[in-house]
């Protein structure tokens, strides 16, 4: 079975200066990418304008890292309509840091994903287990509960706008990385669930990204796994090695 188009997504989180990010964007713009891949850059809200203006590579799109569904009296927030009006068409939702630090439950994440899809966004929806959950043998229960909450809010046709990012929380920013076998096992579990609950056609087209201490050295071996369709990259996406990660999806 051939793989769907891969995705290499940079999650800059709350990092970067105008100078450092401008230099990185210039590097991206000058990079020759000779295969079919969708590259995504999720910057802070403050850096979105600069990124949008400066990033000219045809294989790259910009993304937001979070949003609320509606505009209104929500001081300090940014809404989906505001992002859409600004020309943002991709968004990362449900990242483990949003879940851990800002109290985003499975239900909140699912509501955000559904609202973003309904607003026409391509959504990278994040799921994954903690180290404690993995060591207690609960990886499958946790991950499938998270994706089931999202699926409950979506129609079958909506899945064309959804990308799943599996991010084992214990591997994010820790230097630990899931082995290729661990990544494949989790991705296969997710795809199998989608196949049985949503449809084999949806499962076959669904892009499932791996996120968790991905770097230029381990990306190729991870991507060779049957059900790994690309990456959601944190720390390494702020470095030139993100180009190596993109090229690992060939």
UniProtKB/Swiss-Prot annotation:
The cross-references to Pfam families, in alphabetical order and at most eight, read: TIM
Binding of substrate, residues: 11, 13
What name goes with this protein?
Triosephosphate isomerase, glycosomal
Q: What is its main location?
A: other
Which processes are annotated in GO (biological process)? gluconeogenesis; glyceraldehyde-3-phosphate biosynthetic process; glycerol catabolic process; glycolytic process
Q: How does it associate, per the subunit comment?
A: Homodimer.
Q: Which cell locations does it reside in?
A: Glycosome
State the organism named in the record.
Trypanosoma brucei brucei
Other remarks? The enzyme contains a high proportion of positively-charged residues in beta-barrels V and VII (compared to the homologous regions in other triose isomerase sequences). Since 2 clusters of positive charges located at precise distances on the molecular surface are common to 4 glycosomal enzymes, it has been speculated that this might represent a signal for entry into glycosomes.
Annotated membrane-spanning segments are none
Q: Among the entry's GO cellular component annotations, what is one?
A: cytoplasm
Q: In which pathway does it act?
A: Carbohydrate biosynthesis; gluconeogenesis; Carbohydrate degradation; glycolysis; D-glyceraldehyde 3-phosphate from glycerone phosphate: step 1/1
- According to its UniProt record, which residues of this chain constitute the active site? 95 (electrophile), 167 (proton acceptor)
Q: Which UniProt keywords apply?
A: Gluconeogenesis, Glycolysis, Glycosome, Isomerase, Peroxisome
Lineage of source species: Eukaryota, Discoba, Euglenozoa, Kinetoplastea, Metakinetoplastina
């Amino acid at each position: 079975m051939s793989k769907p188009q891969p995705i290499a997504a940079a999650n800059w989180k709350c990092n970067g200066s105008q100078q450092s990010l401008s230099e990185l964007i210039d590097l991206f713009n000058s990079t020759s990418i000779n295969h079919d891949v969708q590259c995504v850059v999720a910057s802070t809200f403050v850096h979105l304008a600069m990124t949008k203006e400066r990033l000219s590579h045809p294989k790259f799109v910009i993304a937001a890292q979070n949003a609320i569904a509606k505009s209104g009296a929500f001081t300090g927030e940014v809404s989906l309509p505001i992002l859409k009006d600004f020309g943002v068409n991709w968004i990362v939702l449900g990242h483990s840091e949003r879940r851990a630090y800002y109290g985003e439950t499975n239900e909140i994440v699912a509501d955000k994903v559904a609202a973003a899809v309904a607003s026409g966004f391509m959504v990278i929806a994040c799921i994954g287990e903690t180290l404690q959950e993995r060591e207690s043998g609960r990886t499958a229960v946790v991950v499938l509960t998270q994706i089931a909450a999202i699926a409950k809010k979506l129609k079958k046709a909506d899945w064309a706008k959804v990308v799943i990012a599996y991010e084992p929380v214990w591997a994010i920013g820790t230097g630990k990385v899931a082995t290729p076998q661990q990544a494949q096992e989790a991705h296969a579990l997710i795809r199998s669930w989608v196949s049985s609950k949503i449809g084999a056609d949806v499962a076959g087209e669904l892009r499932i990204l791996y996120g968790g201490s991905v770097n230029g050295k381990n990306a190729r071996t991870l991507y060779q796994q049957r059900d790994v369709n690309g990456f959601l990259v944190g720390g390494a996406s702020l470095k030139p090695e993100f180009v190596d990660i993109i090229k690992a999806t060939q």
